[in-house]
Amino acid sequence: MSLSGTLPMTRRCFFATAGLGVAPGAASAGESAAGTADLPRAALLSGGDAKTYLLVFDTGQEVMRGLLAFARKHKLVAGHLTGIGAVRDAVLGYFDPHKKAYLRTHEKGQADVLSLTGNLALVKGEPFFHVHVALGRRDGSARGGHLFEATVRPTVELVLTAYPRPVRRKTDPETGLPLLDP
């Protein structure tokens, strides 16, 4: 089954990458025809009802708090986001599976947001953003991890695509983390 001609190129690429739209038994790029054991759990999020927002944060605003406020105001239930920009301070996390907790680091000072990516889902009916970031420092080094907080200077520019079908997270008994449950 081909998606050619039925969806704009960006959607065609997204769904093909997600492993959707491939006929049963047909091998897609990078997959053997022998099996589907490597396929992720998946759910079709939108057939065209997605909304894409440009979000621009200004100096002094806190990114994660702003994202949550935006999601609540617009009653968003699922989505994904990408972005770039610069921040003056950030709190990053690394999940330690042995401690079953995030180890937090405070990144002080100016840094470029080299890449910011994440998703939006519901936890106990409330919007929850899971965001990772790579920060570039003045000396050319980079720091990255789970983003807990980031204070903008001078701007952070995000593209958020929201889907009408709710996606939920459920607590994983092994890690204690709220993981996606499509």
Listing of model-derived features with the role each one plays in the protein:
Residues 16-17, 26-27, 32:
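Cleavable N-terminal signal peptides
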Residues 21-22, 74:
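Generic hydrophobic alpha-helical segments
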Residues 24-25, 77:
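Generic macromolecular interface patches on structured domains
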Residues 30-74, 78-82, 88-129, 134-182:
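N-terminal intrinsically disordered, cationic/polar leader segments
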